[in-house]
C-alpha cells in the first residue's frame, strides 16, 4: 500500500470519527429517514405562546400582562395587541393543523385572560375561549400540550410583588392559578408544562437586578414543585396526565481544547441548564453553583429538597443553536459578585453573530444531539420533549423568498434527524415541536423576523395564512415521506473546536 492510499484511508477514518462524535452514528447526516423510524408513540407538533399569537389583548375581560407593559413602554419591538389573531381564528388554525398532520399543538394560557387580577374570580370569557380551543383540537384528533406560564405574568401581581418573581407570594399565587387550570381543563389536557424557559424566566425584566436572579429562580423552582405536588395529590390519578417544566438549552462547547475551557463549558451548562434541572433530580443546585455562588445562592430546606426531588414527569427543551465558552477567571474577582460573575466565563454565539439581532441561527443539529446526550448521561435520561426548535427568517423579504424558505427546511431536517439519532443512541425523547406553527409577534423581533410554517402578512386585515415550503415539507414528512439531511449544516469546525463532553 503506497503512502497516498494510506493518507486517504486516514482521512476517511478521521471524517467517520467526526461524524460519530457529532451524530453518534456513521454518516447519518447523509441518509434518508421518515417518521416511521421514530418510536410508535413519538409526538410531532408545533408550538405557540398566548401573548405572541392570540391578539385580542383588550377584549373580553383580559387585563394587562407584563408583556403588554413592556411592549407599550418601548422595551419590546412592536406589540402583540393583534398579532396572528388566533383568539378569533382558532377554528381555522386547528383545521390547518389537521392539514399539516400535527399530532399535538403546544400553546400557553394567558393568566391575565383567565384570572384578570392574577388571583380571585375566573373570567368566563377566558374560560370559554380555552375550553373552545381544547375541544376544537380534540375533536380533530390533535393533542393539547399546555404551558401555564410563558413569561406573561399579570401586571397586577408584578406591581404588588415589586418585581417579577422576587416575592415568595408568587409561589402561592401560581399554585392557585395552576389549580384553576387543572380543575377546568385537566379532564382533557394530559400534558402540562409549568414554565416555559424557566431559566430565562429567572432573568426577569429590564428592572430585575443581577443580584436578584438566584432568588427569582429559587421561587420559580418552588412554585413548579408545589404545583406538581398539587397536581399529583389532587388530579393525576383521575386525569392520568403528565406534568413537567421547560428550560432553554444551548450546546455549550469549549472555545479551545484546553482543560480550562472544557471545564468552563461544563460550568456554563451547570449555571444555565443544571440550575433548574439538577434540583429536580436530587433537590440541590449543581456543585459548581454552590461553590461559586456561596451565600448568594439560596439554600433549600430539607422539606424543600424533598418537594423538589422527582417533581417532574418530563423535561421540555427549547433548542436553537450552540455557543462557545471561554474560561475567564477575572470575572470571579469582580465585585459585587452575582449570577453572571460567579460563572467565571465568557460565552459567544458561533461566528460571533447575535441571532437576537435577526441573524439566522447557526444550523447546528449536532448541538441538539449533544444536549440530549448530556441529559442521558448527566441527568439520568429523563423523558424529554423538544418543545421549541426552528429557524428565524426575515419577514420583510420578498414574498417568493418568504414562501420558499429553504434554509428553514434544511434546519428542520437536520434537527429532526439529530433527534432520531439521539433516540437510537438511547436518549429518552418523547416528542418534537416546531417553533412556530404561524408567523406571529416575536418578543425579540416584533414582526420583522418570524419562525412560522405559515406566512402571515400583518398588514392584511384578513391575516390570511399562507403555507410556506417548510410547512409542505413538514406535512409530507408527517404523512410518511422520506426526508434527507443533505443540507447546509454549520460544522463544529466553525466553532474552532471538536471537543464534546458530557
Curated annotation (Swiss-Prot):
Protein localization: Vacuole
One Pfam family cited in the UniProt record for this chain: Glyco_hydro_1
GO BP of this protein: anthocyanin-containing compound biosynthetic process; carbohydrate metabolic process; pigmentation
Catalytic activity, reaction form: cyanidin 3-O-beta-D-glucoside + 1-O-(trans-sinapoyl)-beta-D-glucose = cyanidin 3,5-di-O-beta-D-glucoside + (E)-sinapate
Predominant location: other
UniProt keywords, alphabetically: Glycoprotein, Glycosyltransferase, Signal, Transferase, Vacuole
GO cellular component, one term: plant-type vacuole
Pathway: Pigment biosynthesis; anthocyanin biosynthesis
Enzyme Commission designation: 2.4.1.299
Tissue: Expressed in petals.
Major enzyme class: transferase
GO MF annotation, one: cyanidin 3-O-glucoside 5-O-glucosyltransferase (acyl-glucose) activity
Alphabetized PANTHER family for the sequence: BETA-GLUCOSIDASE 11 (PTHR10353:SF29), GLYCOSYL HYDROLASE (PTHR10353)
Family of the protein in this entry: Belongs to the glycosyl hydrolase 1 family.
Protein name: Cyanidin 3-O-glucoside 5-O-glucosyltransferase (acyl-glucose)
Species annotation: Dianthus caryophyllus
Gene from which the chain derives: AA5GT
Amino acid at each position: 500500500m503506497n503512502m497516498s492510499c494510506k493518507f486517504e484511508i486516514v482521512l476517511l477514518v478521521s471524517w467517520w470519527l467526526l461524524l460519530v462524535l457529532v451524530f453518534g452514528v456513521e454518516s447519518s447526516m447523509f441518509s434518508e429517514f421518515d417518521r416511521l423510524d421514530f418510536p410508535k408513540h413519538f409526538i410531532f407538533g408545533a408550538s405557540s405562546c398566548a401573548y405572541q399569537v392570540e391578539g385580542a389583548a383588550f377584549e373580553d375581560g383580559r387585563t394587562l400582562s407584563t408583556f403588554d407593559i413592556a411592549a407599550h413602554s418601548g422595551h419590546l419591538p412592536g406589540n402583540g395587541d393583534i398579532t396572528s389573531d388566533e383568539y378569533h381564528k382558532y377554528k381555522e388554525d386547528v383545521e390547518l393543523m389537521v392539514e399539516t398532520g400535527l399530532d399535538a399543538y403546544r400553546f400557553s394560557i394567558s393568566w391575565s385572560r383567565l384570572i384578570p387580577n392574577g388571583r380571585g374570580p375566573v373570567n368566563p370569557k377566558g374560560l370559554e375561549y380555552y375550553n373552545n380551543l381544547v375541544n376544537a383540537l380534540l375533536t380533530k384528533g390533535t393533542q393539547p400540550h399546555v404551558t401555564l406560564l410563558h413569561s406573561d405574568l399579570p401586571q397586577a401581581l408584578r406591581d404588588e410583588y415589586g418585581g417579577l418573581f422576587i416575592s415568595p407570594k408568587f409561589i402561592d399565587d401560581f399554585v392557585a392559578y395552576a389549580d384553576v387550570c387543572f380543575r377546568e381543563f385537566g379532564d382533557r389536557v394530559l400534558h402540562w408544562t409549568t414554565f416555559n424557559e424557566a431559566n430565562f424566566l429567572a432573568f426577569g425584566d429590564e428592572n430585575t437586578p443581577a443580584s436578584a436572579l438566584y432568588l427569582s429562580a429559587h421561587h420559580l423552582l418552588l412554585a413548579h414543585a408545589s404545583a406538581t405536588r398539587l397536581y399529583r395529590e389532587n388530579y393525576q390519578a383521575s386525569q392520568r396526565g403528565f406534568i413537567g417544566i421547560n428550560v432553554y438549552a444551548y450546546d455549550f462547547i469549549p472555545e479551545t481544547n484546553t482543560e480550562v475551557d472544557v471545564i468552563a463549558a461544563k460550568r456554563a451548562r451547570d449555571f444555565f441548564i443544571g440550575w433548574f434541572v439538577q434540583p429536580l433530580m436530587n433537590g440541590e443546585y449543581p456543585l459548581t453553583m454552590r461553590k461559586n455562588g456561596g451565600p448568594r445562592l439560596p439554600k433549600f430546606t430539607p422539606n424543600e429538597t424533598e418537594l423538589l426531588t422527582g417533581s417532574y414527569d418530563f423535561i421540555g427543551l427549547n433548542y436553537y443553536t450552540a455557543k462557545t465558552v471561554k474560561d475567564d477567571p477575572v470575572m470571579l474577582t469582580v465585585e459585587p459578585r452575582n449570577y453572571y460573575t460567579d460563572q467565571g466565563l465568557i460565552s459567544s454565539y458561533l461566528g460571533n453573530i447575535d441571532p437576537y439581532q435577526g441573524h439566522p441561527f447557526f444550523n447546528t443539529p449536532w448541538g441538539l444531539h449533544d444536549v440530549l446526550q448530556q441529559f442521558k448521561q448527566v441527568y439520568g435520561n429523563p423523558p424529554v420533549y423538544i418543545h421549541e426548535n426552528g429557524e428565524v427568517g426575515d419577514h420583510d423579504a420578498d414574498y417568493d423568498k418568504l414562501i420558499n424558505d429553504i434554509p428553514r427546511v434544511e434546519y428542520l431536517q437536520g434537527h429532526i434527524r439529530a433527534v432520531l439519532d439521539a433516540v437510537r443512541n438511547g436518549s429518552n425523547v418523547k416528542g418534537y415541536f416546531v417553533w412556530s406553527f404561524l408567523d406571529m409577534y416575536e418578543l425579540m423581533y416584533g414582526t420583522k423576523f418570524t419562525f412560522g410554517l405559515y406566512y402571515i402578512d400583518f398588514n392584511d386585515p384578513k391575516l390570511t395564512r399562507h403555507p410556506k415550503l417548510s410547512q409542505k415539507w413538514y406535512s409530507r414528512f408527517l404523512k410518511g415521506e422520506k426526508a434527507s439531511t443533505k443540507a447546509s449544516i454549520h460544522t463544529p469546525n466553525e466553532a474552532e473546536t471538536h471537543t464534546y463532553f458530557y
